Amino acid sequence: MKKKQYALVGCCGMSCVLCPRFHSQSSQSKCPGCGLSSNRETCTTYKCCTEQHNYETCAECAVSPCERLFLQADWVGFNTRKKWLDNLSLIKQNGIEQWFAEQLEKQALLEEALRYFHNNRMRSFFCLSFLYFQIDTIKKLVAAAQAQKNEELQKRAASFEEAVKSEAIQHNLKIWDK
């Protein structure tokens, strides 16, 4: 059986470094990543992709996306399935190395946003936003928010949240239920 080289990339195409559970502050819900976690023991996508076929992601599979992948996406509970499919397409097109390098860049920007603009109620909101937005959009949002670093946290957080929502509307993204 192959060991995943990219433990922070789900077989399904999920970018673990942008997942709300990866950034959770609760030890009960925190996940170390799809390739490192005990979750993979029950993940049928992991079993099929890595254990049975020795693939790094489903992007390597000729029948992807398959029903197993869709069933897995329904179980997760975050609005991420469309992004998984987009990610698998990008991995197939550009290679996992290039795709994951961008994910790490997004992660660094996410961690900066969580450090300066997070009011303890928006972690999932930030993670999903950074998962869906293109890197240039994220850089633009974070750069614009930098000017407010000296403001009170609640004001910074509200302003950043509004900017992110506005950007989502401009890109016709419906990421959140609200």
Label every model-predicted segment:
Residues 1-178:
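Cysteine-centered metal-binding/redox modules
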